[in-house]
Swiss-Prot record:
Keywords of this entry: Lipoprotein, Metal-binding, Methylation, Prenylation
Residue span(s) of domain HMA: 2-71
Keyword Protease annotated: no
Chain positions covered by the region annotation Disordered: 74-121
Family, per entry: Belongs to the HIPP family.
Alphabetical list of Gene3D superfamilies matching this protein: 3.30.70.100
Record function comment: Probable heavy-metal-binding protein.
An MF annotation (GO) of this entry: metal ion binding
PTM annotation (Cysteine methyl ester): residues: C178
Positions annotated as propeptide: 179-181
PROSITE patterns: HMA_2 (PS50846)
Descriptive protein name: Heavy metal-associated isoprenylated plant protein 46
Biased composition (Basic and acidic residues): 75-113
Amino acid sequence: MKQKILIRVTMTDDKTRAKAMTKAVQFKGVSAVEIKGDHRNQIEVTGVEVDMIPLIQILRKKVAFAELVSVTKVEPPKKEDEKKGGDGKGAEGKGGDQKGGDKKGPDDKEPPEPKPVPCYPWPLQGYGVPSSFPHQGYGVPSTFPQGDGVPSSFPYPCHPAHPYNDIGEPVYNHEPNCKIM
């Protein structure tokens, strides 16, 4: 979620303003910093998933007293969908046989959904796994989920370090392309 954070910082000269902007841009998730306010004593920080409390604490510690003024969510601009040939279909419909007039183009197809990966128990020793479970020593199953028959570094999709095991934590914007306005 992209957000704008407005912070009032006690800044009296340009050197302090530059220092405050530098500290804000170095913070994780920040994409833009701008000086606002009548007295040029406010900083507007724009970014994705910016944690504002540590940002304010760093500004207080490194620059001067800072306080949170407001936090607003940035709405992405809505794009208007234009229908191709929407006006011309009525006039062409009266003119005789049309084959495939309502067919969907290749752009209208949705990509197929990925198949779910089966989740095998990890590890296989103990933890209530029945003894009739097929295995070949040391708790390694005879057939691996990848289907290659050779143990890999992550043989189980439920392994905590398996690449398919996404726990859904927020993703922070790690773009180094920050700009100071």
